[in-house]
């Protein structure tokens, strides 16, 4: 099909690894010259949140958020946008049941790009300071969009954006038990001896 496959060039994007602290996971990657920490989380059962810490940089970066047509703002501030789910077909008289995707941005900055007819994107401008923001994503029926608006208001009122930098500094040990085993010495009957490290088959994690 002549489409390019494989990893992107590192100066475009590069996955660096992850940090685990308790039940939280922080991804580390770069987009262009800007470093990014990202932690996924949920609000309720169906609002997915991308918590982001974006390093300073001289260039704007663009985030792909969803695929869909007919993007429109849902509130006067421009924080919440709505798109039709990609591939959805709706009869004229069943608009309330139309599958849609709604997204919201909370935090330091972020500008919705509604120009593309098939993609919803978020533009994060260049900045001399690190930026913290949260992107909330929801899918459901058009008639249920008000539930998402309430969820956005609740997230904004309940908590600030998590400190992802702090979560990369390490926390309590995940496994505190000590696993002991033995080494069986080999017979020194030749020019060298081979010792055997006995695998700890009996361990709390049943890992062997």
Model-derived segments and their meaning:
Residues 1-56:
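Extended polysaccharide-engagement surfaces of secreted carbohydrate-active enzymes
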Residues 11-20, 71-74, 110-115:
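Short, exposed beta-strand/loop patches in secreted or surface proteins that constitute
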Residues 13, 33-38, 117-124, 197:
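Short structured motifs
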Residues 25-27, 38, 48-50, 61-63, ...:
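Hydrophobic residues positioned within well-ordered beta-strands of beta-sheet architectures
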Residues 30-32, 53-55, 66, 125, ...:
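Solvent-exposed residues in well-ordered beta-strands and their adjoining turns
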Residues 45-46, 53-72:
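Surface-exposed beta-strand/loop patches in extracellular or lumenal glycoproteins
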Residues 81-84, 88-175:
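Extended acidic/polar, glycine-enriched regions
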Residues 160-208:
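Beta-propeller domains with acidic blade repeats across secreted/periplasmic ectodomains
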């Amino acid at each position: 099909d002549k489409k390019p496959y494989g990893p992107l060039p590192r100066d475009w994007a590069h996955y660096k690894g992850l940090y685990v602290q308790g039940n939280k996971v922080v991804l580390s990657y770069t987009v262009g010259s800007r470093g990014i920490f990202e932690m996924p989380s949920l609000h309720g059962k169906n609002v997915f949140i991308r918590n982001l810490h974006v390093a300073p940089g001289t260039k704007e970066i663009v985030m792909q958020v969803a695929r869909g047509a007919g993007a429109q703002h849902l509130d006067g501030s421009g924080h919440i946008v709505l798109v039709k789910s990609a591939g959805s077909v709706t009869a004229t008289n069943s608009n309330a049941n139309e599958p849609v995707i709604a997204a919201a941005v909370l935090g330091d900055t972020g500008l919705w790009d509604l120009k593309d007819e098939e993609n919803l994107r978020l533009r994060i401008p260049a900045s001399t300071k690190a930026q913290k923001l949260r992107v909330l994503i929801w899918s459901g029926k058009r008639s249920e969009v008000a539930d998402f608006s309430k969820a956005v208001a609740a997230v904004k009122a309940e908590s600030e954006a998590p400190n992802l930098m702090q979560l990369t500094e390490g926390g309590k040990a995940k496994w505190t038990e000590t696993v002991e085993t033995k080494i069986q010495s080999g017979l020194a009957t030749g020019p060298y001896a081979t010792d055997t490290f006995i695998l700890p088959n009996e361990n709390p994690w049943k890992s062997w």
